């Protein structure tokens, strides 16, 4: 069984929601990233998303974009990132890891070479953040390579909800899929709107084998409680943890993660 499936089943069987947090590799440097990963795991993170920096992470927040730039200034050689992921896997052979990046990184590194790097690091899943937006060519070439390597490609449902993605999610999504939470017209998320429940139910009604993870705007325990109330299987936290990494507030990082994880436990 894929480590992601095994971990999600274990968490859901306890009646909890699983928690995924984004680890920006290379921010502030690769050595420190490994120490931050230890904080993640000790504080209750169930699944770690290892983020490879992109020049244009346009689906993400300004703090995440700035984190990507700090990573690239610290280390621009992607081979070093893959070497670090191999070291991480050696340190944590049983932990589920998903690697996220954008198509510019994959294209520049080379699609086949990129998947080989994931395979050599024994990664469980990969999220191509802009897969459905601007990179169908990359998806076309990458999917069979990922399947051959036994690596899940994580699906992403953006807001506004896109009906045409449901068929792919129903038939091909594995592990988990990410649902971008509802925002207002200015893109703000002052809370986790109850309307997210409808979209979660729509995805679940497809019969997909992927667990549903809600993301964007979950930045503290109160928001996590709101997320629990709309009944996803799990949630992902990015900006809030990256802001604490940027300020080197590692105690606050651990407290944040523990608080959010506690909010997922009945």
Where do the language-model regions lie?
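Active-site-adjacent beta->alpha loops and helix N-cap segments on the catalytic face
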Residues: 1-11, 30, 54-66, 73-86, ...
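N-terminal small/glycine-rich loop or linker at the start of catalytic domains
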Residues: 6-28, 61-62, 67, 88-100, ...
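Hydrophobic faces of well-ordered beta-strands that scaffold small-molecule active sites
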Residues: 19-23, 48-50, 97-101, 126-128, ...
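Conserved, mostly hydrophobic/aromatic
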Residues: 21, 40, 51, 118, ...
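Catalytic cores of alpha/beta
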Residues: 30-41, 112-113, 160-172, 218-235
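Glycine-rich phosphate-binding active-site loops on the catalytic face of alpha/beta enzymes
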Residues: 45-57, 121-135, 177-188, 230-250
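Short, electropositive alpha-helical surface patch
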Residues: 101-122, 228-239
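Histidine/lysine/aspartate-rich catalytic loop segments that bind and position anionic ligands
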Residues: 151-189
